[in-house]
Each structure stands twice: as C-alpha cells, then as structure tokens.
C-alpha cells in the first residue's frame, strides 16, 4: 500500500504515467479525501478500511467525519419517508409560520441551527464555516433517530378520529315543533253549528277525530259570537304566529303531565230523539265544557252500556222534573 501511494504521489507531481504512453491519459479515479488533505493521492477503491488517517482528529479530518455522518442520517431519513409513503401513513408537513421559527446561533455564529417550536420535525442545516468538535458530531447522530421516532409517534396519533369534531355534525333540529323544515300552514280545528237547522246535528256529529301519536288535549268551548266552536289551548306555543282564532294548532303535549293519560275520545255518529227529549237540552248537555281536568275533549261513548244507562237515567229524570214544576205552577194558579 505504501508503494502504491508513493507512485501515485510521484505521478501527480511529475505528471508522468507509469505505463510510459504519453498519448493516453489514465481515467480519473476517486481519491481519498483524508489522504489528499495530508498530501497523498490514494485511490478510494479498496482504501476505506486501510486508510492511515481514518481515526485522525485534526481539523480537516473532523470536518470530513461530520459531513459523512450528516449524509448518512439524511439517507436514512429519506429511506424512512419512502417506506411511509409506500404504506400510506405519511401526512403533509405544515409550513411553519415566521413567528414560530427560532434561529439559534451556536459557537459565536460559527454554525446555524434551524429549530421549529410547534412542528414535530426538526431540520439541521449543514455548517458552512467555522470549526466544530467531534463531540458535536456524535451528538447529532444520537439526536436524529430520536427526532424521527418522535415524529413517527406524533404522526400516528393524528390518525385517531377526533370524537368532538364528528359529534358536531349531529345537531338538534332547527324547528322542534315541525316534522320537517317546511312551514306548512296549520290545519283548521274549528267546528260550526248552524242555528237555522233545528233537527240537523251534522255540525256536531261525524267521524271521531283521532291521532295515531297522541290525544288532543284541548277542549271545544263556544266563542263569544256563539256560532263557532274553536279549540282552546292550555299553553299557546305559537303566540308569535299571526293566525286567526279559528285557525289554531294543538300543542304537542298535554298541559297536565302529572296526571294519567286519558282514553281516546269517542264521539257518537248520530243522536236519536228517543234517548234525548228535546234538542235544546241535548245541545246544552253535549256542547257544555267538561268539568274534570283529566281530558280536554268531550268523551261520549255510545257503545259502552254504562254510558247508555246514564243517558237513559238523565232522560227519565228530566220529564219528572218538568211534570213536578207544571203541577206546582198549576196549583199556584188555582189558589189565586
């Protein structure tokens, strides 16, 4: 090895080739940088293990060692990024803001180190000028794998689903009193009783009004005019709507929530004069507001035997009271 180095150094100084052929030039071979710095020209092939200045601690050799370590770390980082891209777990690195950049000058301005406060990656710039010791180079080798492993852990933690973010998609409806977003006009809940037709009970009788979801909690009470029968709410949830008195929408829940749920209302389809003696008394008994607070709708079940017996008992008592009143008035007239 020593003879080869001496011959290469002589040919470099004299410019003569050992082959003696002046017309041909030998192909350019990579030379050892450490040997070149010490004044020797040694081919790099097969020379890495046997270099005399491999463990040299001089100024030039320490710079070469630091450069080799930085290049090896960069190659390892590129290889890891390529593997992450193949696996599909890489994510774009956000650009740092100018306020987050912190430039630290070390060793009296000899080398600059660029550090990011918020991001998980940290890039170190290669030293341009100045001198650094070998201990600094060893610290770089120890720090770079820890930085890459920390960045890998933080990148995997970002893949976890953020539950508060996805829970914001499920919000309560904007209009809780409507089934959908369309504001349909409320349907008519008024009943009119014609006073001209004496025997017609069509305004009162008819098919029962039932709801598949809930019972109507309001009562039919005569208005001030006396001809219209409107529904009266316990709590007016739509006070802001400018609707007339005969267009009222029922509330969703009963105002008496503590009491038991009433049975569905049963309205008779027709009324006969055999059970009820007079039309005026029937009108007064059917259309009077209820006294109990359990149900808001008048319930007259003609199918049950109890209701039939009660109506017959009322019908029997009313003629007796009329006959007693007639006898009292007749006796008073005879006395006069």
UniProtKB/Swiss-Prot annotation:
Residues 1-17, 288-311, 318-327 have a biased composition (Polar residues). Its main location: nucleus. One of its GO terms (biological process) is cell differentiation. Keywords: Activator, Developmental protein, Differentiation, DNA-binding, Metal-binding, Nucleus, Repressor, Sexual differentiation, Transcription, Transcription regulation, Zinc. InterPro entries: DM_DNA-bd (IPR001275), DM_DNA-bd_sf (IPR036407), DMRT (IPR026607), DMRT1-like (IPR022114). Residues 32-79 bind DNA. GO terms for molecular function: DNA-binding transcription factor activity, RNA polymerase II-specific; metal ion binding; RNA polymerase II cis-regulatory region sequence-specific DNA binding. GO terms for cellular component: nucleus. It comes from the Eukaryota. Residues 113-135 have a biased composition (Low complexity). Residues 1-28, 113-138, 285-336 are annotated as: Disordered. PROSITE patterns: DM_1, DM_2. The keyword Transcription regulation applies. It is found in: Nucleus. The keyword Transcription regulation applies. Transcription factor that plays a key role in male sex determination and differentiation by controlling testis development and germ cell proliferation. Acts both as a transcription repressor and activator. Belongs to the DMRT family. This is Doublesex- and mab-3-related transcription factor 1B. It comes from Xenopus laevis (African clawed frog). The gene is dmrt1-b.
């Amino acid at each position: 090895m020593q003879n080869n180095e001496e011959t290469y150094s002589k040919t470099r100084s004299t410019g003569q080739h050992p082959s003696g052929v002046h017309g041909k030039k030998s192909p350019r071979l990579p030379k050892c940088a450490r040997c070149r710095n010490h004044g020797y020209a040694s081919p790099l092939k097969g020379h890495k293990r046997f270099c005399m200045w491999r463990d040299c601690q001089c100024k030039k050799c320490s710079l070469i060692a630091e450069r080799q370590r930085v290049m090896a770390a960069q190659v390892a980082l590129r290889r890891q990024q390529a593997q992450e891209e193949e696996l599909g777990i890489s994510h774009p690195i956000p650009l740092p803001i100018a306020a987050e950049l912190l430039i630290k000058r070390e060793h009296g301005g000899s080398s600059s180190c660029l550090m990011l406060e918020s991001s998980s990656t940290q890039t170190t710039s290669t030293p341009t000028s100045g001198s650094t010791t070998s201990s600094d180079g060893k610290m770089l080798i120890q720090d770079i794998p820890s930085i890459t492993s920390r960045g890998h852990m933080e990148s995997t933690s970002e893949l976890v689903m953020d539950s508060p973010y996805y829970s914001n998609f499920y919000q309560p409806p904007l209009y809780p009193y409507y089934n959908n977003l369309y504001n349909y006009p409320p349907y008519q809940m008024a009943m009119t009783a014609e006073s001209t037709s004496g025997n017609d009970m069509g305004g009162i009788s008819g098919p029962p009004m039932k709801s598949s979801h809930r019972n109507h909690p309001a009562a039919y009470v005569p208005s001030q005019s006396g001809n219209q029968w409107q529904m009266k709410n316990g709590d007016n949830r739509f006070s802001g709507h400018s609707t007339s008195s005969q267009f009222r929408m029922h509330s969703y829940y009963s105002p008496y929530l503590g009491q038991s749920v009433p049975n569905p209302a049963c309205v008779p389809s027709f009324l006969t004069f055999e059970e009820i003696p007079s039309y005026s008394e029937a009108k007064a008994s059917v259309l009077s507001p209820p006294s109990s607070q359990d149900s808001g709708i008048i319930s007259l079940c003609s199918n049950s035997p109890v209701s039939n017996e009660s109506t017959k008992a009322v019908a029997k008592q009313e003629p007796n009271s009329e006959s007693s009143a007639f006898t009292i008035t007749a006796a008073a007239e005879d006395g006069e």
